[in-house]
Amino acid sequence: MAVPDQKSPNVLLQNLCCRILGKGEADVAQQFQYAVRVIGSNFAPTVERDEFLVTEKIKKEFVRQRREADGALFSELHRKLQSQGVLKNRWSILYLLLSLSEDPRKQPNKTSSFAALFAQALPRDAHSTPYYYARPQSLPLSYQDRNVQCAQNAASIGSSGISSIGMYALNGPTPQSIIQGQSNQTPNMGDALRQQLGSRLAWTLAAGQQPSQQSTTTKGLPNTVSRNVPRTRREGDSSGSVEITETSLVRDLLYVFQGIDGKFVKMCNSENCYKVDGKVAVSKSLKDITSKLSELGWLHNKIKKYTDQRSLDRAFGLVGQSFCAALHQELKEYYRLLSVLHSQLQVEDDQGVNLGVESSLTLRRLLVWTFDPKIRLKTLAALVDHCQGRKGGELASAVHAYTKTGDPYMRSLVQHILGLVAYPILNFLYRWIYDGELEDTYHEFFVASDPVVKTDRLWHDKYSLRKSMIPSFMTMDQSRKVLLIGKSINFLHQVCHDQTPASKAMAVGKSAESPKDAAELFTDLENAFQTKIDAAYFDTSKYLLDVLNKNYNLLEHMQAMRRYLLLGQGDFIRHLMDLLKPELVRPATTLYQHNLTGILETAVRATNAQFDNPEILKRLDVRLLEVSPGDTGWDVFSLDYHVDGPIATVFTRECMSHYLRVFNFLWRAKRMEYILTDIWKGHMCNAKLLKGMPELSGVLHQCHILASEMVHFIHQMQYYITFEVLECSWDELWNKVLKAQDLDHIIAAHDVFLDTIISRCLLDSESRALLNQLRAVFDQIIEFQNAQDALYRAALEELQQRLQFEERKKERESEGEWGVTAAEEDVENKRIQEFQESIPKMRSQLRILTHFYQGIVQQFLVLLTTSTDESLRFLSFRLDFNEHYKAREPRLRVSMGTRGRRSFHV
């Protein structure tokens, strides 16, 4: 005999009885049996607060009463109730309605019921407490013959002394009462039933005597035989095969629902569907219903296959795993229904009797029970198909696309799944916008980070948007703000070295805890979620701009660029040119940067630039460009402004190269103005001196006319560059900077400013022809300066010699001598004649110079009139306000005339 386990419940219960009564094991046998009966029973009904099970009970009641239409209507109303979310305790209301539906006029005779129960003695040697089947997660994978198992269980009662307890769901389907007296039981099942009645006391107390139970008669057994016993084929059939029953198909379908082949219903790989075995005979109606029901198994397999494959794929990411978890959760609810259906069949199998036609599970009733699950599985299968090959935000977008449906039941299901799928995305998002941390191992978030990028390019290149991963329930503006928030936090920490906690930097100091409800991503995009994003965006951006302006003087550096690199500080630029002129006229190869730097510092100290911030002045420097053969200092000189740290994010290398190009252009234009000023000074100073040389009047008149044309041209160009280009663009930039909400707005406004002045200063690729003509004009001005300087040198030298000759002549005459000898007079006349003979050469040189200059200006005007920029076309009017060049150039007459007619028609 086996030694009993000292820790088993049976031994412990017997020891407890002995300890309480103070007697031996033999003396407490009666009390021990009573204790077993008490534990095996449940005197208080156990009501589990499960809305699903209460709903299924109500549906079963409709089916039992043959009110399938009312059952379908109840399912639809219940779905609407779930989608509205008005009631919080739906279970309580449903349970109340179920209780009220019982007929109060037919109270069960509890006394007779209890008498019938207690008339059945408990087994004498019961050594185990009853086990109640509590909603398994899935059905058994093996297919067993329930009738054989039931017979074995009944036979084991007498041999082992342990009662075989039927397996019921605590709140599962209510089986028909089998406590109708001994006359209703078949002789071969009576002993087994008597052994089981005591352990089901709790169920009987909870369920009571239903009206259907009181009316149950001995008609149950014939029904059982008719449903379970196979029927032979009709006489007209040629084969002698046996036609399978509806009950067998129901049993098979419960396994097919889980993707397991049954005895008669199996997967057909060629057609990819479940079919009834062709070797067995089934009526057409049953085969059609079986085909409809077996679709659940195919849908189940499709979903299960997807979850099994993706659950093992770690690269699928958190969003994908959440999607799989949502599918698992739906399958779990599906398995719960199968458990209820399975327990309904087990009632009949374990007891060995049928519950009657009204409570039996038929294929048609199975259709009603699986109507809602089939809709859910179809929706899930469609989601699985649509989400193939997607991950992260793209997967969330695919799920979100299915929420745009008019079916409230389907929309509620997909929204629930979307809430689970969007949960990791919301975690990523909150971690990013409140802490600046990006923990995206599997690249699921729509913000991407490049670890190779260094700190100096953090703002521009390190973080970017993965457009394919932006969820469809988020707008591009929201995504851009999310990117800017986290980028600003990282910029503050890594570039500005500002370690201010996020809670202090932002008014909304939300921690990075997991959000309670991810559904706000798609249900309240314009209110709560938008408010959070906007609050974090405005606070973070404002704090970043405050740090840049107060700690790093961003606006002052921007103004310094305008004053020095764009020649806005007029007194400084003029004085610098005066100081640099002796150095810059030399060949470029003879210049030394330290000499030019010293001159720059002198110009700063002598002008209003000395009052600027020392932080700005120390960044101002001299830069020499690459030297080409024949270059002078004017061609290679440039001012430079050193930028580093956070301000280098705004003034990037590309921006500084643009500033350098603009400075060289403005510097050359300013030099032309400087040259023409010197030419005008030469005219004013030498006009009286050369009055005594009438032969030069024609040449000087030519010089004055050409100089006036050049001065007019340069003045109009300077006006255009200074006011229409620089000042207007700068004013627009400054207004944008003051109104900027984030650093990107400042960078964008600054880039637009540079692009505008590059374009309007003719430095872009589209204006290359105009720039070449303008440089040719500048070259002609320099040539004119050289020609006039040569003319004045020759004229002044000749004037000096004439004055010296006259002075010597007067001295000799005062001494009483001849003023001049014949030889000296011949030499003087010869020299004067040679000078006079050189004047036509000078005049022709000036005429050629004038011709070239006017030709270049005319070509420049033609290009201006055909330009697409309206400001450049207006510039052509000012350059030729008196139509001087228009009279000389036919193309100008055509272009301007056409333009005039166009403006007239407009």
UniProtKB/Swiss-Prot annotation:
Region (Disordered): 208-242
Gene field: tubgcp3
Organism of origin: Xenopus laevis (African clawed frog)
Localization (cell): Cytoplasm, Cytoskeleton, Microtubule organizing center, Centrosome
Main location: cytoplasm
GO molecular function, one term: microtubule minus-end binding
Role played: Necessary for the recruitment of gamma-tubulin to the centrosome and for the formation of a functional centrosome.
Protein name per the record: Gamma-tubulin complex component 3 homolog
Signal peptide: none
Keywords assigned by UniProt, alphabetized: Cytoplasm, Cytoskeleton, Microtubule
Entry GO terms, CC: centrosome; cytoplasm; gamma-tubulin complex; microtubule; spindle pole
Database matches in InterPro entries: GCP, GCP_C, GCP_C_sf, GCP_N
GO biological process: cytoplasmic microtubule organization; meiotic cell cycle; microtubule nucleation; mitotic cell cycle; spindle assembly
UniProt family annotation: Belongs to the TUBGCP family.
Complex formation: Interacts with gamma-tubulin.
Biased composition (Polar residues): 208-229
